UniProtKB/Swiss-Prot annotation:
Membrane-crossing segments per the record: none
Protein's name according to its UniProt entry: Toll/interleukin-1 receptor domain-containing adapter protein
Organism: Mus musculus
A GO CC term assigned to this protein in UniProt: endocytic vesicle
Localization in the cell: Cytoplasm; Cell membrane; Membrane
Cysteines paired by S-S bonds: 109-154, 162-194
Compositionally biased tracts (Low complexity): 1-14, 57-99
């Protein structure tokens, strides 16, 4: 009986040191400051460097300010310039510098007789004053002084995308007009929309046989057919872009 009563007495003092040790470790852990793992810090630091190299602003990076590199603390203006688009707009019209329109000096050469100079000037004024700002060649205004007539006529055609033929009774009587008409057909036999006959003061029967394979603009309208000539020139220029 004496031996059985001695067992509780010996086990009681052995539990108290273990409880004290457990309490000491618990207090030590509670007092230990929390610290971010090294692997996580290095991961965030690498992320801030990657964002800086890609041109992103510091506010878009996931790293806190204390872990960001000096290079990532750039000014807002430098960040916005890094994100600005460098490619030009995709939209291109007939007036753009990338258009084939600028491969020649003029958009249209107005061919007319001497007695139709006033009508030719009105047509040129209409085309140049339009929203498209078409570049016109008018012989009396744009031909080089002292230049040979044949050379000037040929150069005017070769330096222009389109040819507007102001076909009138005076045009049919002028040998230079007929020469210019035949030269225009030689450079573009199939026309392809670049030769635009404007019939004015003539019947359909008087239409030159050399041009009867292509449609002409009727100049008997209220605007003298100027609008149709302008639209034909613009349509041809759009095929060049």
């Amino acid at each position: 009986m004496a031996s059985s009563s001695s067992v509780p007495a010996s086990s009681t003092p052995s539990k108290k040191p273990r409880d004290k040790i457990a309490d000491w470790f618990r207090q030590a852990l509670l007092k230990k400051p929390k610290k971010m793992p090294i692997s996580q810090e290095s991961h965030l630091y690498d992320g801030s460097q990657t964002a800086t190299q890609d041109g992103l602003s510091p506010s878009s990076c996931s790293s806190p300010p204390s872990h960001s590199s000096p290079e990532s603390r750039s000014s807002p203006s430098s960040c916005s310039s890094g994100m600005s688009p460098t490619s030009p707009p995709t939209h291109v019209d007939s007036s753009s510098s990338s258009s084939g329109r600028w491969s020649k000096d003029y958009d249209v050469c107005v061919c007319h007789s001497e007695e139709d100079l006033e009508a030719a000037q009105e047509l040129v004024s209409y085309l140049e004053g339009s929203q498209a700002s078409l570049r016109c060649f008018l012989q009396l205004r744009d031909a080089a002084p002292g230049g040979a007539i044949v050379s000037e006529l040929c150069q005017a055609l070769s330096r222009s995308h389109c040819r507007a033929l102001l076909i009138t009774p005076g045009f049919l009587r002028d040998p230079w007009c007929k020469y210019q008409m035949l030269q225009a057909l030689t450079e573009a036999p199939a026309s392809e929309g670049c030769t635009i006959p404007l019939l004015s003061g003539l019947s359909r029967a008087a239409y030159p046989p050399e041009l009867r394979f292509m449609y002409y603009v009727d100049g008997r309208g209220k605007d003298g057919g100027f609008y149709q000539v302008k639209e034909a020139v613009i349509h041809y220029l759009e095929t060049l872009s």
